[in-house]
Amino acid sequence: MLTVISPAKSLDFESPAHTKRFSDPVFLSSSRELITELRKQSPAQISKLMKISPKLGELNAQRYKAWKPPFAPDNAKQALLAFRGDVYMGLDADTLTSRDLTFSQKHLRILSGLYGVLKPLDLIQPYRLEMGTRFRNKRGKDLYEFWGERLTTAVREELSGHRNKTLVNLASNEYFRSIDAASLGHRIVTPVFKDYSNGTYRILSFFAKRARGRMASHIIRERINKPEDLKRFDLDGYRSEEHTSELQSPDHLVC
C-alpha cells in the first residue's frame, strides 16, 4: 500500500533535521529543466504567474537562482522535514522514529510541482511551484502537461513492489490531478474528512488538511499496509462512519 500527500508552501530550512539519512529525488533532471525556465522569469512575472506578493516574487526568484544540485545535507533538507503547513502539522514528522522513517520511505510519497514525486527523505532545496500553476514550458501549457504520464508511471512502478497494490490518496485535488487514475491500473482509496457545520456534515479545508496529515501519520506509526485497516482510524474526532452507507463506496472512506 502506498500513500500520496501534497507538499506545502510553508518551508522550514532553519531547524536541524533529526535524522542524517537522506535520498535523492528521482526526477532531478526534470526539476533542472523547470528551474532553467523559471530563471527566465522576473520577480514581477513570478508574482503575476503565482498570484503572490512582490516580496514573495522576489524571494522565489532568488530561490530559483540559488537552486543548485548536487544536494547534500549542508545545502538541502529531507522533504518530509522541510515542508510545513496544515498537512504537515497533522503529520508531525519531527516526532517520527527511525523505524517510522524507514516505513515511510517505502509507503509514503509527496507529489510536487517542481520535483514530481518525492520520497520522504529525498533532499530538496527551497522552492515554490504549485502543481496547478499555469506555467508554459517546453513540454506544454502547464505543469500537468510537463509531467504528463511520468508521475502515474512512477507510482505504478512503486506499487508493483508492494504486496497490497492500493494507492491511498491523501493529496489535494490539485496535486492528485497529476496522477491518471484511469490508467494507473490499481485500486485507489480516497479518505474524505467532514466536519459538522451549520446543521450538516461538510468538508472544511483547514480541518481536512490537518486530518489528512493525521491519517498519514497514523498509517506510518501503526504500519498500516491494508486499506481495510484504515477504518480503525479514530483521531481528533474523525472516524470511519461505516453505518452511513449512502456516503460510502469501496473507494471512498468518509470520516
Regions found by a protein language model. Give the residues of each.
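Conserved nucleotide-cofactor-binding alpha/beta core module
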Residues: K119, M131-K141, R150-T153, G199, ...
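Accessory, usually C-terminal, subdomains that scaffold auxiliary metal cofactors
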Residues: S183-R239
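Short, extreme N-terminal leader segments that mark the start of a protein/domain
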Residues: M1-P43, S245
